[in-house]
Amino acid sequence: MEASSWLCYQARGFGSSRVWLWLLLALVLLNCSLVLSASPYLVGMGSFDITGPAADVNMMGYANTEQIASGIHFRLKSRAFIVAEPNGKRVVFVNIDACMASQIVTIKVLERLKARYGDLYNENNVAISGIHTHAGPGGYLQYVVYIVTSLGFVRQSFDVIVDGIEQSIVEAHNNLRPGKIFVNKGDLLDAGVNRSPSAYLNNPAEERSKYEYNVDKEMTLIKFVDDELGPVGSFNWFATHGTSMSRTNSLISGDNKGAAARFMEDWAEQMGLPKQSAHANSDDLRSLHKTSVLPRRVSTIIPEPNEITDDLIQLASSYEASGGRRLAGSSITRRIRSTQQNKPKFVSAFCQSNCGDVSPNVLGTFCIDTNLPCDFNHSTCNGKNELCYGRGPGYPDEFESTRVIGNRQFLKARDLFDSASEEIQGKIDYRHTYLDFSKLEVKVSTSAGGQQTVKTCPAAMGFAFAAGTTDGPGAFDFRQGDVKGNPFWKLVRNLLKTPGKDQVECHSPKPILLDTGEMKEPYDWAPAILPVQMIRIGQLVILCVPGEFTTMAGRRLRDAVKTVLTSGNSEFDKNIHVVLAGLTNSYSQYITTFEEYQIQRYEGASTLYGPHTLSAYIQEFQKLAMAMIANKEVPTNFQPPDMLDKQIGLLPGVVFDSTPLGVKFGDVNSDVPGNSTFNKGSTVNATFYSACPRNDLLTDGTFALVEKLDGNNNWVPVYDDDDWSLRFKWSRPARLSSRSFATLEWTVPEDAAAGVYRLRHFGASKPMFGSVRHFTGTSRAFAVR
């Protein structure tokens, strides 16, 4: 019987209205089923500027007192994703372009989220992770040892990070929409090398034989796909240090991971992601990215490239420098990327993993005086550690090394993004607790095959900590691999705090240089209470750790957790993906294996809680995993201190800014040459009379613009200080001078459109009396071939 005849029959027998009602109900239920099947999660992405003070503030990472911020390479961001079950649990993961997470930052972000959303987001389901750039402003951690070189706490650094994290989460929350998640992984072979191979070799040979490399080469990526807009972002985890930029760099930079994120997001924007319409075509994406070069941002309203003619050069010469002028504060925010989009923006984060002993300086370590390789065991040159440096792929150009390592991560992430096909499915879950790592009891195996109970120790740093690493050597006569110490430096140490016998024995064979865990004046020097957290999104499990795990330490932790999750009657199968998110929620320096600790290179000397620190982490994460399997909560008996009110900051504020008589802020000091034409790859620069960037951070704004003359003789912004090609450099003629200069340096991209351009500077000056005043000024115009 045909369907039409059957329907007529049913209508005669039971009444047509009743049949149509049932059919309509069936269609609705079928449609709901399809929607639920297609949208297992709600997914939201967000990002916000956290660049911070671009002047006067010591940079966090190298502990070099002379590394003071004086401009911007490109901006720092907080990037967040939220994944939620439509009627269940949700998790937030935030990746910040900062050296590490900070306990006090995490505390204050959670307070703000509670005030805004109640109990929806809390310490259990929110993770905040740092990429470990060594080129961001410091002073945002609360423990003394991490803010000594920044002259204490820097409120501006702290506030901009807290604000930016909150705003990125708010944006992600507001963007929550039905979507899917895919996971993919693959090896990236040329973005990291082991900087402490002698310590790695002390791990058991049987264990080392299981791995092809002495660093982790695997990148794990998750791809977020909105049901209507298509791909909206990606996060990946890969281990390599943020030390492509050196200890002498003074420009704020996200280093290689920040660069990779910038490249990935620019590539996505070139492709028009997220799409305005549903169902992005993967074939279109593949064909597009195969032809793309290093991504850049350029305004979409710029016309087709102009052919350079004499008339165009003459046109450029008719536009002289504008001279400085006052601005309303709202006029300074002229980002190339519009924040007023009618669709979510594409967000891509390159997260950190077990990078403790992984360097991006892949060419090896060499003595700067002889060009010979450094000593293998101690990383010294004729006994001096300060002469041994690692070399990046762009050596001697640190910017090129940063670009190359960032681009390699971007290209691998792009390939994984494009080929991701394994869909993440399953419930969302999380476990979190705080532990006192200064006295944690740990059961460890003995050589006889039994078990014994040992303890972790109050925090302490060894002599080799002061030797630094091949990414950033220390000073004086310290060296890596020192298990004895030096009588002179022990005398100096004792002026601060003499470690007791129990502390010395607990940390053995580490010779203690700084007994930070027992130093309490003016407040705690090092943390004792630390968070451990495990997040589950389907078959993806993220281990959130507050420190830098070495390669083998991270492998042991991942394997231990995976063994627990896949044993017995667990709902997890062998296809589980376990990633380690380093430098998350708080910071406690390094975690080595027991065997690596014995060698006392930099990483071992910086393992704060003694030789059994890793065993403690493994034990406690196994407990989290067992609790997750059993669907049990994890008790929390400790809380980290909130020491914000105790913070001491000794960095002086800006007193006032000035210019020479007859000169305005924004006037040009050194202009682009008149009647000039520049080729692709050449560099254009102009210097302006400026003021201290600390007067206004121009958050989500810009200090620098490249503008292009369009066909209607309007100046249109095409590059800003978040672009790879444009650098903002700030300087004073003397340390205590009230005068300052801003140099805008633009390297013309190879794919820049030919035409007429100029440079524009934005800033804010502080008078002796009154409020901050914003200003701008432009260079004379020039032609680009």
From Swiss-Prot:
The active site is at residue 359. The keyword Hydrolase applies. It is found in: Secreted; Endoplasmic reticulum; Golgi apparatus. Enhanced activity in the presence of calcium, magnesium, manganese and zinc ions, but inhibited activity in the presence of iron ion. Its EC number is 3.5.1.23. GO terms for cellular component: endoplasmic reticulum; extracellular region; Golgi apparatus; membrane. Its main location: secreted. It is an enzyme of class 3 (hydrolase). This is Neutral ceramidase. Expressed in seedlings, with higher levels in roots than in shoots. One of its GO terms (biological process) is long-chain fatty acid biosynthetic process. Hydrolyzes the sphingolipid ceramide into sphingosine and free fatty acid. Uses ceramide instead of phytoceramide as substrate. Pfam families: Ceramidase_alk (PF04734), Ceramidse_alk_C (PF17048). PANTHER family: CERAMIDASE, NEUTRAL CERAMIDASE. The keyword Endoplasmic reticulum applies. It catalyses: an N-acylsphing-4-enine + H2O = sphing-4-enine + a fatty acid. Glycans are attached at residues 31, 377, 675, 685. It comes from Oryza sativa subsp. japonica. Optimum pH is 5.7-6. Keywords: Endoplasmic reticulum, Glycoprotein, Golgi apparatus, Hydrolase, Secreted, Signal. Transmembrane segments: none annotated. One of its GO terms (molecular function) is N-acylsphingosine amidohydrolase activity. Belongs to the neutral ceramidase family. Residues 1-35 form the signal peptide.
